[in-house]
Amino acid sequence: MSDMEDDFMCDDEEDYDLEYSEDSNSEPNVDLENQYYNSKALKEDDPKAALSSFQKVLELEGEKGEWGFKALKQMIKINFKLTNFPEMMNRYKQLLTYIRSAVTRNYSEKSINSILDYISTSKQMDLLQEFYETTLEALKDAKNDRLWFKTNTKLGKLYLEREEFGKLQKILRQLHQSCQTDDGEDDLKKGTQLLEIYALEIQMYTAQKNNKKLKALYEQSLHIKSAIPHPLIMGVIRECGGKMHLREGEFEKAHTDFFEAFKNYDESGSPRRTTCLKYLVLANMLMKSGINPFDSQEAKPYKNDPEILAMTNLVSAYQNNDITEFEKILKTNHSNIMDDPFIREHIEELLRNIRTQVLIKLIKPYTRIHIPFISKELNIDVADVESLLVQCILDNTINGRIDQVNQLLELDHQKRGGARYTALDKWTNQLNSLNQAIVSKLA
């Protein structure tokens, strides 16, 4: 039996709970018990026979009780494995009729949570939506706030994945209302739940690139101190914060957030840690840091991870201003790097940075240099070279002018030198003034 199947609802543990429950006033029904365990023994080798056998448990029990509830859970699981989804839904709806009186509140909550977690592995979005909506409908009269919150959160995540933001906002409003005081303020006693809501809302604004709302919500989430959040939730919040800061050009803040997100994902065992490590590397390059991000104790074990290796090599080429190697790595590992839309969004900026560094080094010995020659050295079109030169001249990285008729860049080294001497002269005058002030005080 696979781990996933074992985890489905901790069958053995629950069997024990049922047999020896102190709350139960009835003696165990031996026929029911035998029928249940005989059915369970069939499910691996003959699942269809097991379904028929579990049906007999329901018939033997007559009135709704714990053994019928357990039999229905097994039938849901078997039908899921057989991809018999309509029958699975029918059995799930039948099981939900047991939660009001046939089994205890805690037991039903634990079981439904486990079922929802297991079904969440499905890629069939419509099936998941039906599951969550059916659960919420059944919970209207059950008054189980915890299960209602968890189910709504799962439905919200589904809408987020499907980019159905209108439906997601409706869910978020309901979730927020459940965590408010009578005055309509956030109930800080529900800090952990609030952080879950913020994480979901922050992901929505990140997907929509709504930085204004994202920034306010992100700051709000970091000020909740009453919660002991799950590291996965904090990983989501810090990752979205990193994306927000990077889009605003605040590379150092982005670097800090991505590093915190990576550590939280790593702690929770989430596969998002490798994605976030890629973002950390991206921020490291954009902030033009000479420090290798893989020198940190937390990141070092992932340096040679196949998922990360391309980014590791990219850092090396970037720090060495090796544009040929940089572009070669991008081409060779195109899917690994460029399939991520967030990385793709910022690769052009990295290319511009590395081309600028190579350009500065290339033109340094010259007073005049042909633009087609620069084009050849940088391996980009003449039009792209001109665009890069214009940007460098405007931000004073290069002192010069473009002669478009003759396709020349004319450099003014004297202007650059003059600016340096002006700064030195100003500094000397300030030192003289300081010296005179000290002498006057000592006199």
From Swiss-Prot:
Compartments, as annotated in UniProt: Cytoplasm; Nucleus
Gene Ontology biological process: negative regulation of transcription by RNA polymerase II; protein deneddylation
Membrane-spanning ranges: none
Domain of life: Eukaryota
SUPFAM superfamilies linked: TPR-like (SSF48452), Winged helix' DNA-binding domain (SSF46785)
Gene Ontology CC terms: COP9 signalosome; cytoplasm; nucleus
Keyword Nucleus: yes
Domain PCI: 254-416
Sorted UniProt keywords: Cytoplasm, Nucleus, Signalosome
Entry keyword annotation includes Iron-sulfur: no
SMART domains: PAM, PINT
Function according to Swiss-Prot or TrEMBL: Essential component of the COP9 signalosome complex (CSN), a complex involved in various cellular and developmental processes. The CSN complex is an essential regulator of the ubiquitin (Ubl) conjugation pathway by mediating the deneddylation of the cullin subunits of E3 ligase complexes, leading to modify the Ubl ligase activity.
Subunit and partners: Component of the CSN complex, probably composed of cops1, cops2, cops3, cops4, cops5, cops6, cops7, cops8 and cops9.
Family per similarity comment: Belongs to the CSN2 family.
Name of the protein described by the UniProt record: COP9 signalosome complex subunit 2
